[in-house]
């Protein structure tokens, strides 16, 4: 693998692959040769620093890393999360073919379908008013209490699919900061509110702290007996859920082969289903399944997740770019960059291989971004003229949902395409000076100002185009990036499905809480931590 990466570095130098502008000038067919489509989903990577020899080298890299074999092992239900000894089967949750998926010799699809059916019945009953609050009033507001994968996915998808909302209002509480739950409760009528507590073990400290506050809100306003009417849970800890006061009929489970950041397809997606209805949720699953089938069957050069992963690895380890910007030109995808940040950085932010050896490559890049056009007035300056090259990943729909505002969507599309073109083309010193002198500036002043208006260009970007942001399209986008993360993890030869860095933070916070509460001394902690504890306790009221 290391030798193949070094060969790719040599090829990139020999072919001047990073001169993307020259590549377009030399090849009028570059777009058609370095783009591919799956139904209405278009993937354009012609503005990336690649050529035929680079793609050949990346294909050889994928074969050497056995990416396709690892992919097949995941879909087969093999134990690929080796540190937790688990299969990785979020794909089974959206397996619309209903082909058997075996874990330990047992087909999981009957259980998957049973939970999906129970979710649908519960969502229908909440939406129709068949299930009411303790005082007989229809539920108008649903609050999801979770954190991490139990929050980011539902929040992102609910915002993305706002045009399809025809159910109760949705709210999300995640942060243990009391301001989050307090601000949400001020918006609610306890008689018409339902809380969904999303925690597989029902022990997640942030979630259970917020759930206790919500429980006190209902019990205090409506009485202890009302609690069961105003809560549901997504959990497998039936005993703990029961002790909390939630009836087993209102508990929806999922499995240890579903990681939190991959769980939007599971019962964690219940709030989304309540918002958009079970039929639209089904279309969401259909979109994810469509990408699964494409990922499993398409040849590498037409396989969008495979290409996306290979280009990501290439940008990080051949060209040395340390981050990537996710830039959806779709306001309703406002939380999609944050969702992908968790998906990518929690999955591939690892330093040890599957063989328990140090990784020989640079692993997950920093993933960040904002929707366009907002980002253009914030951080695009750095992408265009900063000293680091930051590959950009644009997303744009051909159609918005606001038919009477078509002119605004046209402006949005123009901005998206203009940014990708500008990143590639740039502006030379001569062009910058000519622009200034054409406006009447004298040569001496233009010579001084022009360097500030130079754009080096050759900044790589890729663009994903889809028809319209609907449940099916969103399902495809999420699955596309899930599999991209898988491909990169396979190339790194790491376990993309554990998260011991997250667990470390939980352990340390649990140990420090008694010190913050004043029950234990800070002795044994470093001087910085002890000093910060002392300062906080001194100022606390």
UniProtKB/Swiss-Prot annotation:
One of its GO terms (cellular component) is cytosol. It comes from the Bacteria. SUPFAM superfamilies: SIS domain (SSF53697). GO terms for biological process: gluconeogenesis; glucose 6-phosphate metabolic process; glycolytic process. It is found in: Cytoplasm. It catalyses: alpha-D-glucose 6-phosphate = beta-D-fructose 6-phosphate. It holds the Pfam family PGI. It is an enzyme of class 5 (isomerase). Keywords: Cytoplasm, Gluconeogenesis, Glycolysis, Isomerase. One of its GO terms (molecular function) is glucose-6-phosphate isomerase activity. Pathway: Carbohydrate biosynthesis; gluconeogenesis; Carbohydrate degradation; glycolysis; D-glyceraldehyde 3-phosphate and glycerone phosphate from D-glucose: step 2/4. The active site is at 346 (proton donor), 377, 506. PROSITE patterns: P_GLUCOSE_ISOMERASE_1 (PS00765), P_GLUCOSE_ISOMERASE_2 (PS00174), P_GLUCOSE_ISOMERASE_3 (PS51463). InterPro entries: G6P_Isomerase (IPR001672), G6P_Isomerase_C (IPR023096), Phosphoglucose_isomerase_CS (IPR018189), SIS_dom_sf (IPR046348), SIS_PGI_1 (IPR035476), SIS_PGI_2 (IPR035482). Its EC number is 5.3.1.9. The keyword Cytoplasm applies. PANTHER family: GLUCOSE-6-PHOSPHATE ISOMERASE. Belongs to the GPI family. Catalyzes the reversible isomerization of glucose-6-phosphate to fructose-6-phosphate. This is Glucose-6-phosphate isomerase.
